[in-house]
UniProtKB/Swiss-Prot annotation:
InterPro entries: Ribosomal_uL13, Ribosomal_uL13_bac-type, Ribosomal_uL13_CS, Ribosomal_uL13_sf
Annotated protein name in UniProt: Large ribosomal subunit protein uL13
Pfam families: Ribosomal_L13
Organism: Rhodococcus jostii (strain RHA1)
Top-level taxon of the source organism: Bacteria
Protein's GO biological process: negative regulation of translation; translation
UniProt GO molecular function: mRNA binding; structural constituent of ribosome
CDD domains given in the database record: Ribosomal_L13
Amino acid sequence: MSTYTPKAGDVTRTWHVIDATDVVLGRLAVQAANLLRGKHKPTFAPHVDGGDFVVIINAEKVAISGNKREGKFLYHHSGHPGGLKSRSVGEVLDKNPDRLVEKAIVGMLPKNKLGRAISSKLKVYAGPNHPHAAQQPVPFEIKQVAQ
């Protein structure tokens, strides 16, 4: 008997909603990345986009452990000489909490065409409301580790 290889048409996708309230950012990102890639399914294959949709709510209430709120910086460059900009994690969390959570999760996905397709299934919202109620998302509980 030959080994089963999943095809793109064989995939059934479910919607998961994760509440990010008081969940450490890195632990949230690991769980969401595994759901997006489909690593929780027995039919996982690294070359097939077999993951589920993930909706994250309350991104503004995510926990940042340690001194990372003031001590860790995110950088980007304009492309011009002297154009390096930096912001602390706390500044980004106050201004765009959904981007901070999205950047943490997308950084754990493959850096290729498949990774870009997988990241389109991630939806992050700063508040408790989301427009995906029609998809009937299943709540996903993250087991909390003592901080």
